[in-house]
């Protein structure tokens, strides 16, 4: 009788959350997936930004996803948790900006609050229910602007269903606001690791150390917890040779795209990201991430 061998199960989840652009795949997730595959680590990519775009499309509000969100409206949408379940009180300036955004988008304030208080909690619950998070030992979030609260909120929920899972955060936001990494860890106990700088040089070694319950690798740019204290390996993770960055794997994006029935573009600016350089080409500006 022929023995059937079960395919290895990925133990790492790579996640991008709203409001990451829905017009194209995440180059961050694509690169990290390829890098982990080179190291023999299987991972699943989750494009929850696309799923959220799809949810907004159901209620005719998908145009706001690809809008330029003023006053960090995107962060406001996901701000109920982890901070509180309260609606909160806006100052007059912030509220007026929100009203202006609603008017320009052609939707009512009531609908904005419905997205925040009904659609998003249901969306987060569906993510938890549709995936077996107990199968993963590590979940990694790539952060940019407009993704902070969505990522924190989801990480908190995943930790609730699988307290043993380790959470790793990194991305463009941490490169600009390096002082925020330990502060986020101090405030949010569901964050286990923060990578400061480029992910390629450290991600596979870090995940292998987590899987083997070994000490944090002696590589720059890693914030971690030890005996209740937040520690760092010091420095910044830096990829000094772009040729060492692998070709991004966008398979998960297109599989999800097709499974949702999108046969045409979901936005007139749809694109395929490629990377030819990283950082400020003049060597001057810290916020430059192109």
What are these regions (language model features)?
Residues 23-24, 256:
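Short, solvent-exposed secondary-structure capping/transition elements
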Residues 56-58, 181, 235-236, 245, ...:
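Short aromatic-enriched loop/helix-cap "lid" or pocket-rim segments at secondary-structure transitions
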Residues 5-12, 134-137, 267-270:
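A short, charged/proline- and glycine-enriched loop
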Residues 242-290:
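Radical SAM [4Fe-4S] cluster-binding motif and immediate context
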Residues 44-125:
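Conserved N-terminal ligand/cofactor-binding loop architecture of enzyme catalytic domains
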Residues 5-16, 20-23, 56-63:
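Accessory recognition modules or surfaces
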Residues 11, 19-22, 28, 32-52, ...:
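Glycine-rich beta-alpha loop elements in corrinoid/cobalamin-binding modules
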């Amino acid at each position: 009788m022929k023995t059937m061998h079960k395919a290895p199960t990925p133990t790492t989840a790579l996640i991008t959350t709203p409001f990451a652009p829905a017009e194209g795949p995440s180059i961050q997730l694509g690169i990290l997936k390829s890098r982990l595959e080179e190291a023999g680590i299987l991972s699943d990519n989750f494009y929850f930004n696309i799923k959220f775009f799809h949810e907004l499309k159901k209620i005719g509000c998908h145009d706001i996803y690809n809008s330029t969100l003023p006053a960090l409206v995107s962060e406001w949408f996901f701000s109920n948790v982890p901070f509180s379940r309260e609606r909160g009180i806006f100052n007059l300036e912030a509220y007026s900006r929100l009203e202006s955004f609603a008017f320009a988008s052609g939707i009512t304030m009531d609908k904005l609050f419905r997205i925040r208080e009904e659609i998003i909690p249901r969306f987060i619950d569906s993510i938890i229910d549709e995936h077996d998070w107990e199968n993963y030992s590590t979940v990694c979030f790539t952060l940019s602007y407009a993704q902070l609260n969505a990522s924190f909120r989801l990480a908190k929920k995943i930790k609730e269903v699988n307290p043993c899972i380790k959470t790793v955060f990194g991305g463009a936001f941490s490169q600009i606001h390096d002082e925020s990494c330990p502060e986020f860890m101090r405030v949010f106990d569901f964050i286990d690791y923060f990578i400061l700088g480029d992910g390629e040089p450290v991600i596979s070694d870090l995940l292998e150390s987590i899987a083997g319950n070994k000490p944090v690798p002696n590589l720059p740019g890693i914030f971690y917890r030890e005996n209740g204290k937040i520690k760092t390996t010091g420095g910044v993770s830096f990829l000094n040779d772009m040729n060492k960055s692998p070709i991004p794997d966008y398979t998960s994006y297109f599989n999800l795209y097709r499974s949702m029935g999108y046969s045409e573009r979901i936005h007139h600016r749809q694109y395929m990201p490629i990377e030819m350089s990283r950082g400020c080409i003049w060597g001057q500006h810290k916020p430059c991430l192109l």
